[in-house]
UniProtKB/Swiss-Prot annotation:
Enzyme Commission numbers on file: 2.5.1.-
Region called Disordered, residue ranges: 1-37
Cofactor(s) this protein cannot do without: pyridoxal 5'-phosphate
Gene: ankD
Gene Ontology molecular functions: cystathionine gamma-synthase activity; pyridoxal phosphate binding
Protein name as it appears in the record: Cystathionine gamma-synthase-like protein ankD
Role according to the record: Cystathionine gamma-synthase-like protein; part of the ank cluster that mediates the biosynthesis of NK13650 C, a highly modified cyclo-arginine-tyrosine dipeptide. AnkD catalyzes the attachment of L-homoserine moiety using O-acetyl-L-homoserine as co-substrate. Within the pathway, the cyclodipeptide synthase ankA acts as the scaffold-generating enzyme and is responsible for formation of the cyclo-Arg-Tyr diketopiperazine (cRY) from L-Arg and L-Tyr. The ankA product cRY is desaturated by the cytochrome P450 monooxygenase ankB to yield a dehydro-cyclodipeptide intermediate.
A biological process term (GO) from this entry: transsulfuration
């Protein structure tokens, strides 16, 4: 990829173009040379399936991974330091969390899996004379557990987004020798090796600026989400809550609403991000229903259930769905919500508030800031916005703010604030290129169909919510007539390849093979074919990107002619 460094990956809304190959070697971080990269290169279909199957030849080449899918190097180093402090207890592993509450939720999940095995916690913290702002971010909690519970531990890490971030772990390592530990187990009560007058330590610049950075993010989100309808109250900065990941935001609202009733229930409508159903199901609702087709028939079934006096607390949906790019009927969902008293939570990560105006129809908006809001592919983040026009506004604010703790690490916030300064301009550019690429693919004889908001059956619904100056988003997926053509197209497509979407550089993945590796038949029954290829369109010059797509298509044509 040439000498592309982090600065290039954080390029603004101008076109990106350079000579050489975009595709990175297997296992390389994306962006290249970025210590906090959130994607890893999976350059061939074979590599994707091998990694998901745990094949040693592929796994051993991975230099990093999406932070919720694995343990980042900085976090692993923190885990190693913790185990070394505690003299490496036999068959014991650990996970680090920014708060005791997150650690306790993890403990509860492990104990549900195996009530017999011992699980212990410890809190690392600076001595009491430390500057409070420094002490807040140097502290973290760990859970120590038997290695036999690793599979469950990884599921929790992936689905709930509560783990410590890589930058936070990196900072904690710089303070590690000063940290004491507290625990209900004597063997986990320790004193730091170093000591000096911590009250005299200078605060890092990023701690001083964190309040402004977070306010900039909130202001940008609130302004973008505000409805064009002048009769509606604008979204306020105080209505925006920031989280370390998008999944942490989803789990926060799900936990809060699950506790509101002894008979709480949740609906997931449409085909969501693969982790969302697991997250919602794991947050304590007494009843859970998924309507995975996101169709009119699904809404008819939901209405029939509601009329029969089955009640739900909340409905989760996405605009648009991933990877079908379908749009939910928010008008009808809003009508059902008003009639039967449930809350509507909508994830707008793919549609973006730049493109769609959903405030008139939803009570809560969730956004993964990791994706196009950041764009640079070097930081995680999530947000939850409470609609000030919602009839549930006071209840939601009370539920969420009374338990909210700001755990968004200041350096992550600073990175997001810098990356998102041209958010709207980048969305508009990606909209334009993605529409052109979707049309290019859709016109090709080897392609059976393209999923893009203009090309799927819900296109009229998307138009109802599209802002006057909004486009159709940066994401599309393509289904080839022949599975072998899909594999060849992916292998020959010269773009970044790996997990995540919304990066400033185009990035592709065989979606079902990655997100539904163990449930591909089930996913196919809901409109996600095994050989679907997802493409997130970035800021590259359209002529450059279209030529790369056309080169891959020419390889497909040649294979099909040769038989």
């Amino acid at each position: 990829m040439g000498e592309l460094g982090p600065a290039s990956a954080q390029h603004g809304s101008d076109s990106i173009s350079f000579s050489g190959s975009y595709t990175q070697p297997l296992g390389a971080p994306q962006p290249p040379n970025e210590p906090h990269a959130i994607s890893v290169s999976l350059p061939t279909w074979e590599a994707v399936t091998a990694v998901m199957a745990g094949a040693d030849w592929a796994i051993c080449q991975l230099q990093t991974s999406y932070p919720r899918f694995d343990i980042h190097k900085c976090v692993r180093e923190l885990h190693d330091a913790v185990l070394a402090r505690f003299k490496h207890p036999a068959h014991t592993v650990c996970r680090a969390f920014p708060s005791p509450e997150a650690a306790e939720r993890f403990v509860s999940r492990l104990q549900r899996e195996d009530p017999i095995l011992s699980v212990h916690t410890a809190r690392f913290h600076l001595p009491h004379d430390a500057v409070p702002e420094l002490a807040k971010w140097a502290a973290f909690s760990v859970v120590l557990f038997n290695e036999s519970l690793e599979e469950v531990a990884f599921e929790f890490w992936e689905w709930f987004g509560d783990g410590i971030s890589s930058r936070h772990a990196e900072f904690c390592l710089t303070q590690f020798s000063f940290l004491n530990t507290g625990s209900d187990q004597p063997e986990y009560q320790t004193v730091g090796q170093d000591s000096h007058d911590l009250s005299a330590m200078n605060l890092p610049e990023w701690i001083d600026s964190s309040t402004k950075d977070k306010m900039d993010i909130k202001s940008r989100l609130a302004s973008s989400a505000t409805s064009a309808d002048p009769a509606l109250k604008p979204m306020g900065n105080d209505d925006v809550l920031l989280y370390a990941t998008g999944m942490a935001a989803i789990s926060a609202i799900a936990r809060a609403l699950a506790r509101t009733s002894d008979d709480s229930g949740a609906v997931v409508y449409g085909w969501p991000y693969s982790g969302t159903p697991h997250c919602v199901q794991g947050c304590g609702f007494k009843r859970y229903t998924m309507y995975g087709h996101g169709s009119k028939a699904d809404l008819d079934s939901l209405e029939t259930l509601l009329v029969s006096e089955t009640r739900f607390t909340v409905l989760f949906c996405e605009i648009t769905s991933n990877p079908q790019l379908s749009t939910p009927d928010l008008h009808r969902i809003r009508d059902l919500a008003d009639r039967f008293g449930f809350i509507v939570v909508c994830d707008d990560t793919l549609g973006t508030s730049v493109n769609v105006d959903i405030l008139p129809y939803v009570d809560v908006i969730i956004t993964s800031l990791t994706k196009i809001f950041s764009g640079a592919g070097n930081v995680m983040g999530g947000s939850l916005m409470i609609n000030p026009n919602s009839g549930h506004y006071s209840t939601l604010r009370a539920l969420l703010t009374t338990t909210y703790e700001d755990l968004y690490f200041p350096l992550d916030a600073k990175t997001i604030a810098r990356n998102s300064s041209d958010f709207a301009a980048r969305v508009h550019k990606c909209n334009k290129s993605a529409l052109q690429i979707a049309n290019l693919l859709n016109s090709h004889a080897s392609v059976e169909s393209v999923n893009y908001p203009t090309m799927v059956p819900t296109a009229p619904l998307y138009e109802r919510y599209r802002r006057p100056d909004g486009g159709y988003g940066f994401l599309l997926s393509v289904i080839f007539r022949e599975p072998e053509s899909a594999v060849l197209f992916y292998d020959k497509l010269d773009v970044w390849k790996g997990p995540t979407v919304g990066t400033n550089f185009s990035i592709s993945i065989p979606y079902s093979a990655l997100a539904h590796a163990k449930e591909q038949d089930w996913a196919a029954s809901h409109g996600v074919p095994k050989h679907i290829v997802r493409l997130s369109v970035g800021l590259e010059d359209y002529g450059d990107l279209s030529e790369r797509v056309n080169r891959a298509l020419r390889e497909v044509e040649l294979r099909e002619k040769m038989g």
